[in-house]
Amino acid sequence: MSGVTFDAGGLIALDRNDRRVLALVARAAERGMRITIPATALAQAMRSPARQPRLSRLIRQAGTDLIALNGPDATAVGLLLARTATADVVDAHVAVCARRAGEAVVTSDAADLRRIAPDLKLLVV
């Protein structure tokens, strides 16, 4: 695995000090693996940077890629939502980012992601 992509649930688990997620982030750093965070997922999870030190640290650390929802990705997200008859822009953006990076998704809600992208490898926390 080249790295992992976080959805909002994975980020919230990190913020809540979930030991599995902390270990995964530490292992990724030790092995030089990339961590991808779609900006849409960050927007769902971030509420108070000063009170969310683990999350704030993750987005600043080397090896973390924060991916904006730009024009091409917005189009890919819209096409994916149309193809799957779903409406969650954030989950679709996570799927687009994870597929492009060839990464598994750290999530707490596998059902929603499986509806949008059944082919993705999911790490459920």
Label each PLM-derived region with a short phrase.
Residues 111-119:
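Short loop/helix-cap segments at secondary-structure boundaries that form the rim of catalytic
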Residues 10-11, 41, 73, 93-94, ...:
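Alpha-helix capping/helix-boundary segments
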Residues 50, 107-112:
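Short, polar loop motifs at secondary-structure junctions
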Residues 63-84:
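Acidic catalytic patch
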Residues 5, 106-107:
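Generic enzyme active-site microenvironment
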Residues 1-37, 46-64, 123:
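Short, well-structured N-terminal submotif of metal-dependent ribonuclease cores
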Residues 45, 88-104:
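Acidic, metal-associated active-site segment
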